């Protein structure tokens, strides 16, 4: 069976955006689309039964949510094979399990009110940090901000030899017919003994060399752009992502925890990026 594009749905506006993105991604990759609703309704509402259907109320609601999502996906991409499922369990752990047999997972995430309005929900962060496949996260916000300057933005980290994120970004660029913009920030060493005469070389040139190495195996048909701004990596990526179609970042295994855990850069751009973000797990 072909690996599906899995979309987590809950009936919210961000999750419907995720359905749209998932349908497009499935069409681009020739993959089936799987729409999943997960909840602990059995634990909390087992005694509350929808009388006319003899089923828990939230299960009835869940079936309605996935039915609406299925109709939306079929309308958007009629040629894509669509299946649905309602799972009993914690949404984040259900979706991490789904990621083990998926080509990618797509999630929508709402902002919160007040001072934390730009922060992501725990489900998106948990899945992005522990999934076995790439995870697209679409934050709530004005959709017309996406794609004003259509391109795929790639965060080039300290380990360009870890090529999973590069390959994924290049695939997205090739499938969508968009340029690939590789970004690596740099900072000039500070202190009285860290000038150019100390032997460090030009930090911007070093950043360009790292980017060139990362892009070495990108297909010839993909146009590439290079951006090496001075400053903090997270801030540089958020700025580069303005108007972009997608920002791609890698996630690396970390010892002392379950599976992948997001580093500061990936965590930061998931909270702040003005466009969809794809988190791609790199092999250990």
Which positions does each model-derived feature cover?
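Acidic (E/D-rich), amphipathic helical modules within compact regulatory domains
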Residues: 25, 82, 92-97, 103-129, ...
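General small-molecule cofactor/ligand-binding pocket signal
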Residues: 34-36, 83-87, 136, 181-183, ...
């Amino acid at each position: 069976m072909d690996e599906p594009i899995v979309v987590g749905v809950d009936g919210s506006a961000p999750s419907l955006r995720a359905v749209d993105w998932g349908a497009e991604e499935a069409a681009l990759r020739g993959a089936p689309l799987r729409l999943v609703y997960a909840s602990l309704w059995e634990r909390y509402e087992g005694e509350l039964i929808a009388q006319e259907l003899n089923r828990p109320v939230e299960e009835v609601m869940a079936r309605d949510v996935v039915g609406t999502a299925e109709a939306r996906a079929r309308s958007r991409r009629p040629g894509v094979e669509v299946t649905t499922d309602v799972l009993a369990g914690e949404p984040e752990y259900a979706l991490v399990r789904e990621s083990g047999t998926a080509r990618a997972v797509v999630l929508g995430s709402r902002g919160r009110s007040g001072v934390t309005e730009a922060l992501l929900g725990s489900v998106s962060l948990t899945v992005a940090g522990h999934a076995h496949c790439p995870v697209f996260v679409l934050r709530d916000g004005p959709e017309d901000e996406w794609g004003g300057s259509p391109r795929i933005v790639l965060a080039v980290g300290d380990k360009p030899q870890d090529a999973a994120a590069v390959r994924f970004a290049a695939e997205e660029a090739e499938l969508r017919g968009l340029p690939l913009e590789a970004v690596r920030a740099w900072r000039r060493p500070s202190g009285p003994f860290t000038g150019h005469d100390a032997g460090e070389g030009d930090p911007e040139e070093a950043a360009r060399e790292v980017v060139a190495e990362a892009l070495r195996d990108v297909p010839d048909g993909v146009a590439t752009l290079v951006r090496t701004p001075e400053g903090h990596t997270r801030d540089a990526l958020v700025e580069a992502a303005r108007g972009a179609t997608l920002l791609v970042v890698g996630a690396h295994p970390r010892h002392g925890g379950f599976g992948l855990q997001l580093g500061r850069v990936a965590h930061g751009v998931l909270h702040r990026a003005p466009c969809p973000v794809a988190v791609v797990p790199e092999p250990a």
